[in-house]
């Protein structure tokens, strides 16, 4: 479908905010000079919402006192965090930290963006921005330990491993997320079992939702394959194997199952008869896939569709677990 508003759908109107300033417009000239116009009880209001960026500089002055007998010099203590001649406040530091990490903006772009916003008044060094992560990790150590323990008790956890670069070297980031919003990131030099050591996954005893990284199958007590990934793989097969029918049928079935599952309330159990019918259709489509690949084997340069078929056949239970477990989501979007 095309981006933007969809025909036949109710639009998402912009919400008005509490005004910070009100301007009453004067009556039009023709109203002032025509006595036939009478003021009604109706008033039309329209809002223009904007933002502004201001630099706030608080300068502290502390007089120095000298003791002529002892030679001692003292002054009033400065507030906490005011140590150097120039110090940056928490709002500014948090802004740069989120810009650099949550918005995935480089250090150079982050400092340049801040400089542009403040008309060049604030130019922060790269080193200071780089140290924000270390400072954040140190200050949140107790919170991260608490989240770690809470995650171990969650019945469902989403996990993923993605590539990254640290100081120009290839690295990996393991992500662990639970439905209530808790998320932890673990930087590792290796993937596989070595990378999982020290993460929540290592000692987790619940159900894991993940893509088809077989390493994760050694952990947890249950597994749900990320169906968002599966749908993308099926779409790729549809684009590259246009003569096959199983991929289109399976794509449609998975969408139908997700729609059914999402339509259930939190307290509502899936209907056993409906689930059984879904499972039979799943097996039938895989049988069709087997016949199609027997009749026309996969090509030399594209075998992803065939590999997907074999995977969905071998790990059938892990693709359909969400039909039996109401706590599961059908994708690992939480960790994405």
Residue ranges and their predicted role:
Residues 1-84, 130, 159:
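Short, flexible loop/hinge motifs at secondary-structure junctions
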Residues 52-155:
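Short, positively charged, Gly/Tyr-enriched micro-motifs
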Residues 66, 99-106, 170-183, 230:
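Short conserved beta-strand segments at catalytic cores or DNA/RNA-binding microdomains
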Residues 118-122, 126-213, 222:
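RNase H-like nuclease fold core
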Residues 212, 221-249:
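Conserved beta-strand -> loop -> alpha-helix junction used to position metal-binding or nucleic-acid-contacting
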Residues 253-308:
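Long, amphipathic alpha-helical stalk/connector segments used for oligomerization, subunit docking
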Residues 329-335:
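Conserved small/polar residues in nucleotide/adenosyl-binding loops
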């Amino acid at each position: 479908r095309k981006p933007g508003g969809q025909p036949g759908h109710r639009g998402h109107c912009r919400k008005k905010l509490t005004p910070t300033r009100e301007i009453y417009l004067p009556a039009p000239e023709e109203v002032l000079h025509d006595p036939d116009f009478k003021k009604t009880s109706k008033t039309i209001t329209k809002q223009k919402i904007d933002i502004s960026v201001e630099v706030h500089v608080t300068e502290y002055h502390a007089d120095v006192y000298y003791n002529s007998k002892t030679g001692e010099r003292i002054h009033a203590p400065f507030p906490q965090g005011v140590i150097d001649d120039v110090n940056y406040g928490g709002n500014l530091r948090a802004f740069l930290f989120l810009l650099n990490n949550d918005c995935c903006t480089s250090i150079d772009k982050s400092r340049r963006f801040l400089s542009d916003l403040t008309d060049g008044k604030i130019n922060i060094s790269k080193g200071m921005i780089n140290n924000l992560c270390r400072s954040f990790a140190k200050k949140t150590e107790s919170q991260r330990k608490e989240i770690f323990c809470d995650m171990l008790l969650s019945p469902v956890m989403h996990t993923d491993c993605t590539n990254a670069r640290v100081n120009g070297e290839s690295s990996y980031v393991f992500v662990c997320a639970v439905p209530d919003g808790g998320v932890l990131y673990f930087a590792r030099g290796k993937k596989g079992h070595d990378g999982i050591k020290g993460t929540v996954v290592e000692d987790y005893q619940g159900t894991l939702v993940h893509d088809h990284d077989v390493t994760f199958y050694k952990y947890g007590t249950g597994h749900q394959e990320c169906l968002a990934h599966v749908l993308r793989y099926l779409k790729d097969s549809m684009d590259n194997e246009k003569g096959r029918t199983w991929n289109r049928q399976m794509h449609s079935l998975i969408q139908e199952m997700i729609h059914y599952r999402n339509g259930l309330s939190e307290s509502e159990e899936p209907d056993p008869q409906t689930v059984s019918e879904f499972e039979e259709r799943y097996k039938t489509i895989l049988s069709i896939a087997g016949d199609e690949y027997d009749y026309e084997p996969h090509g030399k340069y594209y075998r992803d569709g065939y590999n997907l078929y074999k995977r969905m056949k071998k790990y059938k239970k892990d693709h359909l677990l969400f039909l039996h477990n109401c706590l599961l989501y059908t994708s690992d979007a939480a960790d994405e």
